[in-house]
Amino acid sequence: MDKKPLNTLISATGLWMSRTGTIHKIKHHEVSRSKIYIEMACGDHLVVNNSRSSRTARALRHHKYRKTCKRCRVSDEDLNKFLTKANEDQTSVKVKVVSAPTRTKKAMPKSVARAPKPLENTEAAQAQPSGSKFSPAIPVSTQESVSVPASVSTSISSISTGATASALVKGNTNPITSMSAPVQASAPALTKSQTDRLEVLLNPKDEISLNSGKPFRELESELLSRRKKDLQQIYAEERENYLGKLEREITRFFVDRGFLEIKSPILIPLEYIERMGIDNDTELSKQIFRVDKNFCLRPMLAPNLYNYLRKLDRALPDPIKIFEIGPCYRKESDGKEHLEEFTMLNFCQMGSGCTRENLESIITDFLNHLGIDFKIVGDSCMVYGDTLDVMHGDLELSSAVVGPIPLDREWGIDKPWIGAGFGLERLLKVKHDFKNIKRAARSESYYNGISTNL
């Protein structure tokens, strides 16, 4: 389908989309050779290029927006027209009106009025037996002056016939008066864009059904009011970001249990990736954010922790216990449960006491501390071989390993060890019952799971 220019799109909807995703009502606009002069209902004026590929043109074609201008007072009718793709996709049908051949009429004096045609067979109609079909008499002049579309005429005929028959069975001599009053039309069904907008505003604690039949604007207004109150309450009381708060809570948990906190570089040599067994033929290699031919953003915390274990083994007593919390980066294609920028927790212990039982005990204490249900199942992965997966339902929270493993030799490690890695965003998703992991991530669109596009 051809991309329509901006003037065609705003003429079809009567609306304007700002750079911030705000819908405005257009009061007046003029189109020159390459420019459009627009006056909004709120009083704002602007001059824009009549482009097919501008941000506003794309937004109008995709029928998406963030909010409406309060001063423009965009009506529900205008909003539904904008959100319904039919106004752009429907093909128009040209109707050719053909007039009937005119008959020559005799001229009549202006002073003489045309008398209505008398009803025919009135007496015969009144004398009909009760078993015959009832047909209310309609003046011929009325029949000639009222034009009804065929579809409407058919439905009216079927309704009146059914009502007439029902009334005659019940003995009602005036079946027209027995017809019930028309039923009030319910609110139109929500479009996909409207549903997506409301789901962004919904929180797990909201007991609001999107199938309640309420108009979109009423549902949106109620949810916007709730989200603003939620943000105001956070600003007045807690003032803590969920991700930062969880990081501090985890840090305190492991420090209290004798683990040393590590903060290692985010930019690492590509050589580390190769030493982890990730070559160019593996799937994980395609997910690496390469900075240049020598460095990349770390996709995991393990390489730096391997180096710390080897170096600290020369100075610290047995066993060595360390942990790190920090951002990692991968080019992920599945956005439902994965993020390209995510926060990892890795903890490991090297030396004595590195058994599966001890590893499961640390994991159990940790998740019980956070109040998260889980189960541990066996699995395997490309990097570490056999692993223990920590699951919450169908969601993987962690992969845990009991060493030594063959990969250790690449990093100069020759002692037994245990360790596990957790994604903090997944822990928050489970802890707060978020439907979308992006609500728990570093984001400008959400704060503590609350949409900021208000």
Curated annotation (Swiss-Prot):
Q: Where is this region: Disordered?
A: 102-138
- Residue ranges, compositional bias (Polar residues): 123-133
The UniProt entry, under SUPFAM superfamilies, shows:
Class II aaRS and biotin synthetases
What EC number(s) has UniProt assigned to this enzyme? Answer: 6.1.1.26
Keyword flag ATP-binding: yes
Q: Name one GO biological process term.
A: tRNA aminoacylation for protein translation
The record's annotation in InterPro entries points to:
aa-tRNA-synth_II, aa-tRNA-synth_II/BPL/LPL, Phenylalanyl-tRNA_Synthase, Pyrrolysyl-tRNA_ligase, Pyrrolysyl-tRNA_ligase_C, Pyrrolysyl-tRNA_ligase_N
Record Gene3D superfamilies:
Bira Bifunctional Protein, Domain 2, Helix hairpin bin
GO terms for molecular function, please?
ATP binding; pyrrolysyl-tRNA synthetase activity; tRNA binding
**Per UniProt, which keywords does this protein have?**
Aminoacyl-tRNA synthetase, ATP-binding, Cytoplasm, Ligase, Nucleotide-binding, Protein biosynthesis
Q: Where in the cell is the protein located? A: Cytoplasm
Catalysed conversion reaction: tRNA(Pyl) + L-pyrrolysine + ATP = L-pyrrolysyl-tRNA(Pyl) + AMP + diphosphate
Q: Which HAMAP family match?
A: Pyl_tRNA_synth
Query: Briefly, what is this protein's role?
Result: Catalyzes the attachment of pyrrolysine to tRNA(Pyl). Pyrrolysine is a lysine derivative encoded by the termination codon UAG.
- Record family assignment: Belongs to the class-II aminoacyl-tRNA synthetase family.
Q: What is this protein called?
A: Pyrrolysine--tRNA ligase
Q: Which organism is it from?
A: Methanosarcina mazei (strain ATCC BAA-159 / DSM 3647 / Goe1 / Go1 / JCM 11833 / OCM 88)
